[in-house]
């Protein structure tokens, strides 16, 4: 059970703080009109609203996730609280403490009132929370060490979890028992492709990405992408140690391997070739990679694809900008790409997520920030 209602009321860690002049309303103005293609607005995102911790103690946000409709955002934090935001209203609407078990990798299921998350203490189980009742519907127990990644199928109630116990478990939300299990070397990141038929698993110690047919996960992977040579070329000092994110683009053509220092890899999702290496950041995100035992705050990677699959947005490390890369600029295999834009921000971007439906994104470090295309910025470019 989440903590008591009394604790719930005392644990309201964030309040909305406008940045500069009052921002335009987040909602309906953020609806993507036919003329608002990602290419038209990507350079013009600016912070529109900031949710700052109201308590004296400041905690790091460790994960962000949008629901399928793009109408809600869930954040998990070091303060062991699940925070839910209404995107259309531009406000925080619910705070659910999970003091007993902790919380990380909070993910909406396909039911917007249900959230799946990993535990950070007591045990290493996964928990399915009913937001309306503020009670747990189900526990999923099989892992013997910390969970490092949760990935939900885009087409069903199945999901996969990765753990430091060197296992990947396959689940159905309707059953507390794992449907299957893989034993691999450091399989700390995983992702479904958009068709929900392929799962990619990143094995950091072997510098490889394994592709499985989800329906035949117990068979050998049908493809293995070996990145050892590419790591030696682009990231020699952090080989096998700094992968933080694995994500397919929505068109299924590209696979992002986010790292926490030198840059990010964009692979051809079919061939495994490195189409581009994304540079331009200054330092690390300040979060622990899944393979790390540094004691840094947890995270989920600081880069992601835009909804059209053409761009990658990511944190700038110590320089406090959000960087934008256009992967269509990769004219040859292995292109080294610099950002096409640096979106100004006053704080660090340790986590970033694109809204799946609206022209809007969210970032976080110690505060959650909503970003919207700024009309004044667009007008100045005309």
Where are these predicted regions, by residue range?
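WD40-repeat beta-propeller superdomains and closely related acidic/aromatic-rich repeat-like regions
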Residues: 2-382
């Amino acid at each position: 059970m989440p903590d008591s209602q009394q604790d719930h009321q005392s644990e309201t860690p964030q309040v909305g703080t406008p940045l500069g002049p009052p921002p335009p309303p987040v909602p309906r103005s953020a609806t993507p009109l036919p003329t608002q293609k990602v290419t038209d607005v990507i350079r013009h995102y600016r912070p529109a609203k900031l949710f700052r911790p109201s308590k004296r103690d400041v905690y790091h946000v460790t994960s962000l996730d949008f629901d399928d409709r793009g109408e809600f955002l869930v954040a998990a934090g070091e303060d062991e609280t699940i925070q839910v935001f209404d995107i259309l209203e531009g406000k925080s609407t619910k705070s659910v403490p999970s003091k007993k078990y902790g919380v990380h990798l909070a993910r909406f299921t396909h039911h917007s009132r249900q959230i799946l998350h990993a535990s950070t203490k007591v045990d290493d189980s996964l928990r399915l929370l009913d937001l309306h009742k503020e009670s747990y519907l189900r526990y999923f127990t099989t892992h013997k060490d910390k969970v490092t990644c949760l990935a939900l199928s885009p087409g069903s109630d199945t999901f996969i979890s990765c753990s430091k116990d060197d296992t990947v478990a396959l689940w159905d939300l309707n059953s507390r028992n794992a449907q299957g299990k893989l034993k691999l070397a450091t399989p700390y990141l995983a992702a479904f492709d958009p068709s929900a038929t392929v799962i990619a698993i990143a094995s950091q110690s072997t510098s490889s990405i394994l592709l499985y047919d989800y329906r035949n996960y117990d068979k050998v992977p049908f493809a293995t992408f070996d990145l050892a040579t590419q790591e030696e070329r682009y990231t020699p000092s952090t080989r096998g140690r700094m992968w933080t994110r694995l994500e397919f683009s929505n068109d299924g053509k590209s696979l992002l391997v986010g790292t926490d220092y030198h840059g990010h890899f964009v692979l051809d999702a079919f061939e495994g070739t490195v189409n581009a290496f994304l540079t331009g950041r200054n330092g690390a995100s300040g979060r622990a990679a899944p393979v790390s035992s540094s004691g840094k705050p947890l995270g989920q990677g600081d880069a992601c694809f835009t909804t059209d699959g053409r761009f990658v947005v990511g944190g700038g490390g110590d320089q406090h900008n959000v960087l934008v890369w256009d992967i269509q600029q990769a004219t040859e295999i292995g292109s080294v790409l610099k950002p096409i834009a640096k979106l100004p921000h006053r704080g660090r971007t340790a986590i970033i997520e694109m809204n799946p439906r609206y022209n809007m994104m969210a970032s976080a470090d110690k505060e959650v920030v909503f970003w919207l295309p700024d009309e004044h910025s667009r007008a100045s470019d005309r």
